[in-house]
Structure formats: C-alpha cells, structure tokens
Amino acid sequence: MKQFLALVGFVIASITTGCGQSHTVWLDDLDLTAMTQGNGVAMKNKSVDGKTLTIGGQTFERGVGTHSVSEIAIQLDGKAVSFTAQVGLDDEIIEHKTSAEFIVIGDGARLWSSGIVKAGDAPKLCSVSLDGVKRLELIVADGGDGPYYDHADWA
C-alpha cells in the first residue's frame, strides 16, 4: 500500500490511500533531540523559555519553540504531500528589536522563506508542496542583527 505524509500546522499527517484512513502525528510528538539550535533547548508545545507559544498576539497549543540559528531534519522518503505552519518570533521577546528568517528546504532546494520577520509581527503562513521530497529541513536563521532573543516558533 502506498502511503503519503502531509505536514499540516506543523503536523505530520500520514494518509493511507489503500484503506482510506488517515493518521495524524504532530511534529511535537516526534523525537527532537537531533534538532540543533544556537541557544537553549527546543521546547515541545512551548516557547524556548517554556511559555505558551504566542506570535503576534495569537496563541498556539501545538508546535515547537526554538532559538536561531536552528535546524531540524526530517526523513520523508518521498512520502510527503505538503507542509503547512504558522511561524514567527514569540511575543515573549517583543520588547527586543530582534529578527529572524524561517526557511524550508527540501532535498537541498529552498522551498519557502518567510523573509525577515520581526518581534511583534503577525504569524506568517508557510504552505509548501512536498511531492517526492525525501529530506525536509526546517531552519531558523538570524535576521541580520545577531541571534540575540531570536525566540522562534513553528506552530
């Protein structure tokens, strides 16, 4: 049976076409120990400081809080359909003039970039096709002003 994966709202959803059933696995349910980041430890369902994920005044129950520069690689083996997430800098650092860039890489090619986001900006929607992609990388890069207070959320 052929299986497909769809990443939705920072989710990995497995849709089995033969049975007509779908199974959703949230990324925060996966092992994130291989994630690298510039400061602190990636947090599941919380900001990097352990608070509620909040971007531009909007809160999120699920996702991953990280700090630039960060990267997580996910092996998809060509079974993915799409990736969708809300991204931005967490409101916990809103008083700091900080910036970052969210980047999605598939098999070494840039699939999407947020451009530079700043503290206090509304969440940005990321939605990309992953047809045939074997390896997905989710990266948070410094926005050009140093990595200080770059508390970045994938929600």
Regions found by a protein language model. Name each.
Residues 1-8:
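Bacterial N-terminal signal peptides that target proteins for export
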Residues 4, 13-15, 52:
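N-terminal start and proteolytic maturation junction detector
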Residues 10-23:
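Bacterial Sec-dependent signal peptides at the C-terminal "C-region" and cleavage site
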Residues 21-155:
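Gly-Asp-aromatic-enriched flexible segments
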